[in-house]
């Protein structure tokens, strides 16, 4: 992700220095103004045996944002563009993701789950003594974790979050050069991540200016470029935080011409979703493809710090999918209301039937109501209850095209095909098949081609 990708950090405490936004931005720029040619050389080394003899892609300057990936020849839909191993992985440190070993990702027991060498990281007994864990274990022990003498065993998400950055310090020279060459957004909120991590240790080197500058930039690179990649181990699935540099260089498009997926958290696979002409920029998406225009652009503005200018963002019907649509609030009208201006974050909304215009504040409350109502059901209902809710109750307050309701249908599909192992009635299976066809029809209208979501829904990839 050239100008953005997963979240941002700011200048750490200790050592003083200029903390103006201009200074932060200069500090986070790619190392020594790395040229696309130099970046390509670093990527070649990183790819190793996965680099094709005659790749169908190249790295070049982009009019979208800085640098991008471009087709060196015509690429057919479905064709492999590249595969890439993660440069570094680590835990997401999200609630619900704290009970896996940071090395092998097996589920940990309820007691005795911290490293036996007292680094306070969640590591299984086998991995505690592994070479893979040794350097980071010594690193954390040198900083003297405050939780080491705690009466009750617990995983500290703040110190766990910084682990991926610590692993970057232990990469090889050329790998570190690649990290330095990557974009890192300047964001003051990053400072909190580092300060919160520092407060977990008695001997965190906050006064070491060189170290703190390096850490700040590494955290910036990770928050700007890292992906969350699912990894299955020992019969359960966890999310890893992985840095895939080439995948991250691809720029954003709301309905991209390429799609990516991950194999067990450590391998990214990128394929063409549509035909890509020679010289065309190869794009990915930084958002969910089925989110509505307004939701996507709020997410991009808040987390990636840019506004998208793609064709889809200029079409308030989104190719006739009406993913953002809500019901009209005018008495007696059941028409669809959609945002009038798709390029603003607080647009007026207009009914396409009665043409009444409603202020954003009113429609935002309506959308929030639908979002919260549906999400609460997703988090608490059985599959059978969700089907009843989607079919009988949702039509009273939410159009069938609204992206939140589409997410609910996807939730049922995932639970019935990927996670649940119970038997379902033919009627329940019929509802799931109908949801699948509805989602596939929306993807077709969007022109999403052979995207990852389509392949997941149809079972082409797991």
From Swiss-Prot:
UniProt keywords, alphabetically: Methyltransferase, S-adenosyl-L-methionine, Transferase
EC number: 2.1.1.-
PROSITE patterns: SET
Pfam families noted in UniProt: SET (PF00856)
Keyword field contains Aminoacyl-tRNA synthetase: no
Superkingdom of the source species: Eukaryota
Keyword flag Mitochondrion: no
Coiled-coil intervals, chain numbering: none
Gene Ontology biological process terms from the UniProt entry: methylation; negative regulation of gene expression
CDD domains with a match to the protein in the record: SET_SMYD (cd20071)
Record's GO cellular component terms: chromatin; nucleus
GO molecular function, one term: protein-lysine N-methyltransferase activity
Gene3D superfamilies, A to Z: 1.10.220.160, 6.10.140.2220, SET domain
Domain SET, chain residue ranges per copy: 55-287
Family named by the database record: Belongs to the class V-like SAM-binding methyltransferase superfamily.
Identification of the protein by name: SET domain-containing protein SmydA-8, isoform A
Organism: Drosophila melanogaster (Fruit fly)
